[in-house]
Amino acid sequence: MLDLKIIPNTINSSDFHIFFCEKNFSFNPKKLTFTNINYKEINSILFKNKNEDYFVFNYHSTRPKKIIFINQNEYKNNFENQNIGGKVINEIKSAKEINVIFSKEDKSLENFYFNFFLGSFLKKYSFNKYKTIFKKNENINEKINLLISSKNKNFFSKIKNDINNIVSGVFLTRDLVSEPPNYLNPQAFVNEIKKLSKLGLKVEVFDHSKMKKIGMNALLGVAQGSKNLPYFVTIKWKPNNSKNKKPLSFIGKGVCFDTGGISLKPAKFMEDMKYDMAGAGVVVGLMKTLALRKSKSYVIGTVALVENMPGGSAQRPGDIVKSYSGKTIEVLNTDAEGRLILADAIYYIDEQYNPEFIIDLATLTGAIVVSLGNEYAGLFSNDDKLSEKLINVGEIENEKLWRFPLHKNYDKLMDSKIADIQNINYSGGAGSITAAQFLQRFLKNKTPWAHLDIAGMAW
């Protein structure tokens, strides 16, 4: 766990220092007064390594014991800066305080500083709440202070605040995805979401009876095999001075555990299916960060929370359900459950809020992992402009997206003989595409929509 502290031109007697040089490792030698190591020796070694991102000096017999020199060159994107910060913080073990010194502070490098420290924070994340036995000297819960020596307190305080707001949302998502399924069932997930109300988010929860009353039968069908009841939750952020009249909508698949239902998954690696709620986790983390940052945008986050279990009352292959949209769905495979809960969620949000766009995030298909592995998420969309924006942002943040086709000719693969639509392409092939084609049928309006299949990226 990291914390940034700004101390005006003060250098503590720490064993560890991070020293930000200027371009090509050039630096002001007067800034090295905290050590008696040879300036010429350092300068010579750094010059030979001027193309590196950072360089580590270890001094076992003097203080400080370690100095990491950072090369303030221009970098291509935010992720590269974050990666450097993560690597640097990983070089320092068992430190309680780390001094951060600048040869020359450059406010034009705010983006570099921000992403460097953001990467450091993200690197130090760990999930160990259920561990009671630790290795010797394994101080993973200890707080580490990064002590920034600077006169520009306001400048670095803003960076610190922005980082804390982002990290708070990211770590909430990581915690939710990491929780074991016997702890994070749908009710427990709802309890975590309700805690966000104190940030100014408006949380509305539909329970089983409410969903049954309004006809969310596609969602309810998935949940009927589990003793843990399902929930449908909307999380609204609407500032008084919002810059958009129509909300931006984000919908997350929240299958808290997926056995496959009656169409049971293989036992091997089934434990990983606790992550089948990752899309919902992303949406909840996003909404927390938006609230902390006092976003000017009107945003609605939606999560559909269920367990997919093979109980005595479980949905059967061959069942037909009437969705919230009124369309009937023949359930040929109960392990294609994510699209069923998203069908009700998408139609409800489109009908009730008429949003500016809808983006759904779901660990939807194994087929996307076959296609893209763990490097790209699949992108499916009815709108070129929305797709382009998502792809561009993904490149900057290293959350890479690859766009797949949508075409009406795929629809025949999902047509049912006895219902309006079936939930799988029974003949096989184009698994991720036909899943997206299925979802597209549950847009009520011509709303710009993007489906992100994150099955290969979320865990």
Description of each model-found segment:
Residues 1-254:
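Short amphipathic alpha-helical segment within the helicase RecA-like ATPase core
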Residues 1-2, 62-63, 173, 190-459:
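A generic structural signal for tightly packed, nonpolar segments enriched in small/aliphatic residues
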